[in-house]
Amino acid sequence: FTEDVKGFSIGGPILEDKLFFYGAYEESEQPRFLAAGYAGSSNGVERPWLSKENHDRIENIAKDLYDYDPGGLPGDGAQTDEKYMLRVDWNINEQHDATVIYNYYDGVQLRSSDGDDNEFEFANHFYNKGAVSETTTVRLRSQWTDALSSEMFYSKNTMDDSQVTAGPRDFADMQISIGRDTVYLGADDSRQANALNTESDFFKVAGEYLLGDQVVTFGYERETLNVFNQFVQHARGGEYDFFDDSLANSAACQALTAQGRFDDSSCGLSGIDRFELGRPSRIYYGSGGG
């Protein structure tokens, strides 16, 4: 396979012997071999237990009966990354110098949700896993006297993590059993409502004093961490297993509400895409300091 990496760096003085800068940028892309298909499809890793007839039957039911496009056969994906760094160094005077550094990262990759040999998932059942991170650090070093020196350091980091289904979120996770094997379509049940954001701050002051043959150190530091974590499985509907019964639904059944479907024994579970099973959430928050 081929991995593409592009980048550059540049640096030099802004003010001679006083102020300097450095910057670097890099982007990369590498393939992820995710393609899969039915027997004889010549698309990635074929599933010998899945015939073209059954594949087309499931796809046509989704499109014609539920007005949902499952995305077709999945192709290979990619992982892309973008990152850059900026740095400034300042020689304030003979006693003091400062450094500021900024780092940025943005990466995403396409992943399969259920990719075992006994599983096949349409393309819209895949999901994109990504993260965006920013970090800023500031450092000030001081030599007050021959005996006394100090350092101040501050760092701030934010990170946004994402897991987003490749297709529409408003169609529940469907599992169609073919013997002991399974076909998946719809939004993966664990990627329908996800959010993870963190923000951390770190501050430190340290000093050192030479007292004769002794070295006295002192300092203070504080770290805070805020976390927001949301994971709502089945936010747009849970996992539903069916196959032949999906063809047997009458037109009248398709118009019933979710509750009506469960209460009416003459109806199958073919209207699952309309289900709203509530949106509970779990949120975590934490902070600490010392």
What annotation goes with each model-predicted range?
Residues 1-132, 144-146, 158-160, 173-177:
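Acidic, glycine-rich flexible loop segments
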